[in-house]
């Protein structure tokens, strides 16, 4: 006879790691070239002037300056730009 009952099984017990997405530098904030402005999945925010886009759609500053957000075009696209200082 078994001294203990069987352990059973469960379908739970796993979780994905956090991805730390979102806006990292807000409007009016001063940033340096290379600073990450937005980490995102897909292009929720589009790159404006002086902003580069990485292969995972991360937006980053190409020059030193201040961050500015705007809604542009007939599709109401949210764009991020850097105003050089």
Curated annotation (Swiss-Prot):
Pfam families: Ribosomal_L27
Biased composition (Gly residues): 1-10
Organism domain of life: Bacteria
GO CC annotations, alphabetized: cytosolic large ribosomal subunit
UniProt keyword list: Ribonucleoprotein, Ribosomal protein
This protein's record includes keyword Phosphoprotein: no
Residues covered by region (Disordered): 1-20
GO biological process, one term: translation
Any one GO molecular function term: structural constituent of ribosome
Protein family per UniProt: Belongs to the bacterial ribosomal protein bL27 family.
Record protein name field: Large ribosomal subunit protein bL27
Species, as recorded: Methylibium petroleiphilum (strain ATCC BAA-1232 / LMG 22953 / PM1)
Lineage: Bacteria, Pseudomonadati, Pseudomonadota, Betaproteobacteria, Burkholderiales
Gene name in the database record: rpmA
